Amino acid sequence: MVDSIGDATPLQIDMLILQKRISQGNLENIAEFSEGLLNRSRSTGERDHHVEARVRMDRALMGIIDANLVGTELKWCVDRLNALCSGTALHGLALLNLANWHRNSGESIMSLIVHADIRKDLGHPEDIVGLSRLEAARIYVTLNDLDPAMRHFWSARQSFQRNKMSSESLVASLEWLDLALEEVSDSAPDMENRLANAAPRETGEATWIPSNPKDVKLIVEELFPILTRDLSGENRNDIGLIIDSSDILQFSLWKEILVERIDEIQDPNVLDVLQS
């Protein structure tokens, strides 16, 4: 919306103030403040369709409007921004919000349809694409459709890595690994092959493809130095995944390192496995 603060209009500057207040949780009189911005964005003197769409989206998400109108309002924002600035970060954010609303309303398939409109080839920024793929993967898990879930986790991880979003990449990798360890096969296609050869399927056709051990090893080798910086904590399911990977791949090094540092581990379940 604003290339630089020096080019911003007074309305756009106030819009940035609204965004900062929301991010900081400073919501006192936020309904009145946002309504003022909305009215200004529609006025003859300060008309700004981008600001109008952003304010309407924020007001819907904050529950300022009638709850029965939230979905309609978010859809309006998507359509307006598609016409104004398709493929931008703001358009992608609007799509993400609409997809999340559908999911929270129990409409998983509709959410996936919206997520499918967030694409790098349409211009959407990589971070938005990554967040979309991560959320879509989680929806596929709830539908027990695990092949596309694994592909979307992998795609999300790649987007996050290219955008240097290390925390998000860690999350996507762990969620992928949790699925991958269900079945590992030397004859299974690797993830790059699965992404390259993915094809449309019949709706509701759940699928499962085992993971390739090379992919599992790649992920664990990425995760291991990060997860083992600090082994404390009484609920370390992430370390449990490392141990499972070590056993399944019959690659003892990871487990041996954990045994050497067993005094640092607090999770009783992890301790039981390492001491057995």
Q: Residue spans of the language-model regions?
A:
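Structural register within alpha-helical repeat arrays
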Residues: I17, E52, M57-R59, L98, ...
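C-terminal non-catalytic interaction modules
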Residues: M1-I13, I17, D186-S276
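Amphipathic alpha-helical segments of tetratricopeptide repeats
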Residues: E35-R42, K75-A83, A116-G123, W154-R162, ...
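Structural signature of alpha-solenoid helical repeat junctions
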Residues: T9, E46-V51, S86, L90, ...
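Structural motif corresponding to the intra-repeat A-B loop/turn of tetratricopeptide repeats
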Residues: Q24, I64-D66, S105, L143, ...
